[in-house]
């Protein structure tokens, strides 16, 4: 098995409090399996050679712009917006061959027979000696998102967030989803009456939130239906 992971990030401060960042990451893995079962382990006295290769690739690009501003001594504002793109690809190739001439032949040369017949109860069936399977799947996800954070004296906090995702796993008429959220908090440990009377309390906070979440299909072509 081999796995390679890389990440690249670049940031630039346009002005005080305003930053732009872009990042690119990739995750690549390849797994191979070769397996041989000798004939004496099979009820039909057939050996079996199996070979499989699986390849997975994930690429993620994120682009963010963020702004932070302190207004006077009491107000703090933070803004963030971004776009991301994720691409996933899975590839599989595998197969098996049975009944090699000798248990010392671990792989399946092209000269091996492709099939045989078996008769049982007056019925003759064809048994395949060779089988091959391949698969390749792709899916992508595009996201637009933003967030506004405000707090007053680090005591009263408000967060508004919004995300819009588009996934290739859904049908063309239902590809996009919208996911808003809102949260409010109170850091009561920052209140003077708490500090004066409860010196042993280092931090205390109450937070309430609401949001909408979602997920996309694990199978990339489920929305296409059965042909």
Positions of the model-derived regions?
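Extracellular/periplasmic, surface-exposed regions of secreted and cell-surface proteins
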Residues: 1-37, 47-227
């Amino acid at each position: 098995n081999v796995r390679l992971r890389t990440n690249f990030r670049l940031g630039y401060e346009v002005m005080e409090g305003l930053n732009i960042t872009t990042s690119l990451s990739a995750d690549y893995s390849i797994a191979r399996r070769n397996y041989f079962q000798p004939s004496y382990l099979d009820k039909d006295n057939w050996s079996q050679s199996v070979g499989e290769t699986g390849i997975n690739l994930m690429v993620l690009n994120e682009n963010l712009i963020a702004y932070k501003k302190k207004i006077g001594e009491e107000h703090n504002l933070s803004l963030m917006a971004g776009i991301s793109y994720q691409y996933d690809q899975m590839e599989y190739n595998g197969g098996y061959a049975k009944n090699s001439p000798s248990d010392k032949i671990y792989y399946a040369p092209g000269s091996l027979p492709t099939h045989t017949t078996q008769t049982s109860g007056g019925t003759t069936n064809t048994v395949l000696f060779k089988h091959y399977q391949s698969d390749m799947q792709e899916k992508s996800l595009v996201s637009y998102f933003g967030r506004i954070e405000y707090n007053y004296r680090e005591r009263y906090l408000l967060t508004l967030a919004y995300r819009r995702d588009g996934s290739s796993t859904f049908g063309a008429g239902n590809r996009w989803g919208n996911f808003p959220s809102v949260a409010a908090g109170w850091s009561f440990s920052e209140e003077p009456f708490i500090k004066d009377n409860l010196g042993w309390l280092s931090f205390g906070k109450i937070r309430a939130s609401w949001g909408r979440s979602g997920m996309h299909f694990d199978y990339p072509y489920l929305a296409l239906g059965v042909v």
